[in-house]
Amino acid sequence: FLHSSKSTSTLASCAAVLAAKAIPIIAEVDNSLTIDPIDLENKITPQTKAVIPVHMRGVPCNMDQVLSIAKKHNLKVIEDVAQACGGSYKGKYLGSFGDCNAFSFQFHKIITAGEGGMVTTDNDLYFDRAQAYHDTAACWRPGGPAKRFASARYQGELFPGVNFRMSELIGAVMLAQLHKLDGIISKMRKNKSRIKNGISDIHGIELRHVHDSAGDTGISLVFFLENGPLAEKFAKALKAEGIEASSIFNKGIPD
């Protein structure tokens, strides 16, 4: 599994790969701080099975190139949309490009029910697998739990599952949150645009590149300064003014 750099991404994506008894291979990021297609292709080996583009901090990866590389090497694509729910790439929603796509509704995501998440796919087999895995694999056999000793639904595909079922209460909250998503995204985009216009003439600030600015969720404003100490000093000054800011994963050292 190929995954964007740990120093600018999150452990959860790698942990999911390890939980599947696979080995995550870390790819570098480009100046958007999302997966670098050039390094992605350089890291592919005969053992590579899938690529996980992480739409980090609300902006889309370069999906044209990611999908092209995946098709060339016959790889599955698993989008990590945890921080970019509601974002898009060239007019198409993030989370609709991959073979499977993962969303998070944890408490500091764009919309939340406190915890929980969602998997989307347009592949019937993958849907059935996900449904079974999250529900102790009981529904994997025809007839569900009542016929747990029936033959396998798909030949040669019996496996243990876990309990990742979302409660009805959290599901109801999330349905209400989904109706608010467009309004939340719109407000964040307007706020980000105002800030960008306000700092456009400040020397030394280089805004992060965004592969499709129209699809940016607006959840964060990321820019580069000359060095790490200056970035930390800058963040401290912003915090003193009541503006939440930090350098990315302070002192984080990838293994």
Locate predicted features:
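Structural detector of well-ordered beta-strand residues that form the stable sheet scaffold
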Residues: 1, 25, 77-78, 102, ...
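Conserved PLP-binding catalytic core of the aspartate aminotransferase-like
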Residues: 208-255
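Active-site region of PLP-dependent enzymes
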Residues: 84-90, 97-220
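Conserved donor-binding loops in enzymes that form glycosidic bonds
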Residues: 56, 178, 223-227
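Basic phosphate/pyrophosphate-binding loop/patch that engages nucleotide-derived ligands
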Residues: 67-76, 113, 118-139, 229, ...
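PLP-dependent aminotransferase-like
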Residues: 1-84, 88
